[in-house]
């Protein structure tokens, strides 16, 4: 995983009942809810600091709500094709084999190996190696996929040890 820090403006929408004396708290909560730990366009905000030293731009009324561009210092994380990650092998059935790596889900394609069911548990076989469900494995990221709301998703292959 790689990361970078940038200054930017994050647009958030506030409803009229949120425009009270607690507006700073409501803005902070709206920014965190909309952007923190959410995968958007291949990157995820891991840390957001709202800049108090910069004046807040005027809001814009849109459909009976107020859109505010909030000045922030944002630490983004992202993954590259070719990165090697480590996580837990999760075999739900023959067609759904993933590796869970915190904020990253690696999907293994059918041609990555075969799934077998023996001794009341699933096993994944690749190049003569057997991997039990639930063990720690390493994988190389092959192709970015459409992410979920709070996770990156990549096609990956297990790195044979």
UniProtKB/Swiss-Prot annotation:
Transmembrane segments: none
Enzyme class: transferase
Keywords: DNA-directed RNA polymerase, Transcription, Transferase, Virion
Signal peptide: none
UniProt EC number: 2.7.7.6
Free-text description of this protein's post-translational modifications in UniProt: Apparently non-glycosylated.
GO cellular component, one term: virion component
Catalysis performed (reactions): RNA(n) + a ribonucleoside 5'-triphosphate = RNA(n+1) + diphosphate
InterPro entries, per the entry: DNA-dir_RNA_pol_18kDa_poxviral
Any one GO MF annotation of this record: DNA binding
Subcellular location per the Swiss-Prot or TrEMBL entry: Virion
Gene Ontology terms describing biological process: viral transcription
Source organism, top-level taxon: Viruses
Pfam families reported for this sequence: Pox_RNA_pol (PF03293)
Similarity comment: Belongs to the poxviridae DNA-directed RNA polymerase 18 kDa subunit family.
Described purpose of this protein according to its UniProt entry: Part of the DNA-dependent RNA polymerase which catalyzes the transcription of viral DNA into RNA using the four ribonucleoside triphosphates as substrates. Responsible for the transcription of early, intermediate and late genes. DNA-dependent RNA polymerase associates with the early transcription factor (ETF), itself composed of OPG118 and OPG133, thereby allowing the early genes transcription. Late transcription, and probably also intermediate transcription, require newly synthesized RNA polymerase.
Record text on subunit structure and interactions: The DNA-dependent RNA polymerase used for intermediate and late genes expression consists of eight subunits Rpo30/OPG66, Rpo7/OPG90, Rpo22/OPG103, Rpo147/OPG105, Rpo18/OPG119, Rpo19/OPG131, Rpo132/OPG151 and Rpo35/OPG156. The same holoenzyme, with the addition of the transcription-specificity factor OPG109, is used for early gene expression.
Name recorded for this polypeptide: DNA-directed RNA polymerase 18 kDa subunit
Gene that encodes the chain: OPG119
């Amino acid at each position: 995983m790689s990361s970078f820090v940038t200054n930017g403006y994050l647009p958030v929408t506030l409803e009229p009942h949120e425009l009270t004396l607690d507006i700073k708290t409501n803005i902070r909560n709206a920014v965190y809810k909309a952007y923190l730990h959410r995968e958007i366009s291949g990157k995820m905000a891991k840390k957001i600091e709202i800049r108090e030293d910069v004046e807040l731009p005027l809001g814009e009324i849109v459909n009976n709500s107020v859109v505010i561009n909030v000045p922030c210092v944002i630490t983004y994380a992202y993954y590259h094709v070719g990165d090697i990650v480590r996580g837990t092998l999760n075999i739900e059935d023959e067609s759904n084999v993933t590796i869970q790596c915190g904020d990253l889900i690696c999907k293994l394609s059918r041609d990555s190996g075969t799934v077998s069911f023996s001794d009341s548990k699933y096993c994944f076989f690749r190049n003569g190696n057997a991997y039990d469900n639930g063990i720690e494995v390493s994988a190389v990221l092959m192709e970015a996929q459409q992410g979920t709301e709070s996770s990156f998703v990549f096609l990956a292959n297990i790195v044979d040890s």
